[in-house]
Amino acid sequence: MNQLEQLRQFTTVVADTGDFQLMKQYTPQDATTNPSLILKAVQKPEYRHLLERAVQDHHGNGGVDAVMDEVLIAFGCEILAIVPGRVSTEVDARLSFDTTATVNKARHLIQLYEQRGIARERVLIKIASTWEGIRAAEILQRDGIRCNMTLLFSLVQAVACAEAGAQLISPFVGRIFDWYKKQAGEQWDAAANGGDNDPGVRSVRQIYDYYKKFGYPTEVMGASFRSTAQILSLAGCDLLTISPELLEQLAGGQGPVVHKLSVDQAQAANIARITADEPSFRWQLNEDAMATEKLAEGIRLFAADAVKLEKLIGEIAK
């Protein structure tokens, strides 16, 4: 068995891409998208028609906002024709500090999916793991709208999401790794910070262990990988969402895959509970320079790509 096949024995494999033609060969269970991945996909000739059709059908009726939503849903529906499970569709990052607007947008996206015959159980609404986003997820989950909490870089964010009843979280491995590597500069020791000691891997393992120790049902889906080594160090995580490039490397890899994360190990671990009410959340996040900076940066980057997509829509609509 190749490494991808071995990994599937321990973990649900998810494709992290808007390029739905490319994901077919890896037969993922679920798929995730984000504004950056959708922007990248619509710039390819083979997906241009989805953008043009959305502009043609909706620009005169609802403007750019309606077209943006239609593009997200169009990609989601195409992906759901390929994967047997769920697709993650992201709420505009510019709503990350507005609970009411996030709830309204999520409900609208689910309504659009349901109008196309897609059951809400097959859709995860991606929301940034700000305090306001987590409160939106709490409301949505009560409505039966499942949420995927993204841009998650710290244990306190993870605990707040679980206590809000979020369906799933996406802790970002690679971006955590990037931050620590950049901070270390020339002092970075690749060997000492690789494998199980990779700071991004350690963060996800800490969150996974906490959830399993205290019996939270929220799913943990490691995301944002820079290498297959990071992925294989998290074998056993509930889900891992992986880019096509890294899926290809795993499919070509022949080394053994070791089961790294397990419920039994987590439950046996000595872990202290933490408080994740609003004052504690804001303080602990503020104390974590990496998480604070990467959350802010991630929101800015996703928002910038949403603006680029709007400009692209405007050019086509002329």
Curated annotation (Swiss-Prot):
Gene: tal
Family: Belongs to the transaldolase family. Type 1 subfamily.
Active site feature: K126
Subcellular location: Cytoplasm
Keyword Cytoplasm among record annotations: yes
Pathway assignment: Carbohydrate degradation; pentose phosphate pathway; D-glyceraldehyde 3-phosphate and beta-D-fructose 6-phosphate from D-ribose 5-phosphate and D-xylulose 5-phosphate (non-oxidative stage): step 2/3
Assembly description: Homodimer.
Top class in the EC scheme: transferase
First-listed, main subcellular location of the protein, grouped into a coarse class: cytoplasm
Catalytic activity: D-sedoheptulose 7-phosphate + D-glyceraldehyde 3-phosphate = D-erythrose 4-phosphate + beta-D-fructose 6-phosphate
Gene Ontology annotations of biological process type: carbohydrate metabolic process; pentose-phosphate shunt
Protein name: Transaldolase
Key words of the record: Cytoplasm, Pentose shunt, Schiff base, Transferase
Highest taxon listed in the record's lineage: Bacteria
